[in-house]
């Protein structure tokens, strides 16, 4: 699993170690070429803090040049991100509910792909609007497991308290074909 934050304003992924940065708009293309350092399993893997200049690629601002296509392009990006990563949490750094969900996953030794919306500038609020369109939920955290929308903090904690979260995580791990 990958723990990361995305900074669309600077177009780089950041996290806790010193692996190279990966541009957000390159996710689907790079992953298909086998260059993205994601392991599709529930074991912790971390991609790192930006240590070189971002590669040249189309930016979210470029993708958002027309209002009619920006929503659909961001929607495609969200759908691809959710489909290609077993656990994704759209979060805000200052949100206590987001912190609770991230702590829960950490206690389960699951490191989700974390997208910190408040660190993305205007793209963060655009992504939050796209998430509302897709899920009907505007608040964070917005949790996806195995490509399915789980809900927010209370939904995730409720699944955990009922003993159902681990089974959902195991199923998501199985979908990704690795243990």
Swiss-Prot record:
SUPFAM superfamilies associated with the record: Thioredoxin-like (SSF52833)
Gene3D superfamilies in the cross-refs: Glutaredoxin
Gene Ontology annotations for the cellular component aspect, listed alphabetically: chloroplast
Compartments, as annotated in UniProt: Plastid, Chloroplast
InterPro entries, sorted: Glutaredoxin (IPR002109), Glutaredoxin_euk/vir (IPR011899), Glutaredoxin_subgr (IPR014025), Thioredoxin-like_sf (IPR036249)
Principal place of residence: plastid
Annotated positions of the N-acetylalanine modification: 62
Superkingdom per UniProt: Eukaryota
Positions of the Glutaredoxin domain: 75-176
Residues of the transit peptide: 1-61
Binding site for [2Fe-2S] cluster: 95
This protein's UniProt keywords: 2Fe-2S, Acetylation, Chloroplast, Iron, Iron-sulfur, Metal-binding, Plastid, Redox-active center, Transit peptide
Pfam families associated with the record: Glutaredoxin
GO molecular function: 2 iron, 2 sulfur cluster binding; metal ion binding
Role according to the record: May only reduce GSH-thiol disulfides, but not protein disulfides.
Family in the record: Belongs to the glutaredoxin family. CPYC subfamily.
Protein name, per record: Monothiol glutaredoxin-S12, chloroplastic
Species of the source: Arabidopsis thaliana
Gene designation: GRXS12
